[in-house]
Amino acid sequence: ETGYQQAKSLLALEVRPDAIVAANDNMAIGTYRAIQEAGLSIPGDIAVVAFNDIPVAQFLTPPLSTMRIPGELIGEVAVDLLVERLNGRDYSKHVTLPTEMIWRASAKKPSAS
């Protein structure tokens, strides 16, 4: 619902965006609906990308381009950080986790230049 409402707001702007980046794949599903109801095509009129790479993303029409985020690893790292805090770590810690962009048909992959 949120992705749908947010996309409708963006599509109502005088200058429509070329692309919408949804916070997650579920919001992108609502975004697809709003774009299709407006009679626009993905990615011809507006590209859509999101985050998570849920299983259904590959079966949308067109298949959703999405950033694959390692959910299980995020959970493991979060627990490790919590245990460190409970054991007395009193400083901030920066953690970088691997991601992978999965290019499908909802957005064009940028050319390597």
Curated annotation (Swiss-Prot):
Pfam families: Peripla_BP_3. One of its GO terms (molecular function) is DNA-binding transcription factor activity. SUPFAM superfamilies: Periplasmic binding protein-like I. It comes from the Bacteria. Keywords: DNA-binding, Repressor, Transcription, Transcription regulation. The keyword Transcription regulation applies. InterPro entries: LacI/GalR-like_sensor, Peripla_BP_I. The keyword Acetylation does not apply. Repressor of the lactose operon. Binds lactose as an inducer. PANTHER family: HTH-TYPE TRANSCRIPTIONAL REGULATOR GALS, LACI-RELATED TRANSCRIPTIONAL REPRESSOR. This is Lactose operon repressor. It comes from Rhizobium radiobacter. The lineage of its organism: Bacteria, Pseudomonadati, Pseudomonadota, Alphaproteobacteria, Hyphomicrobiales.
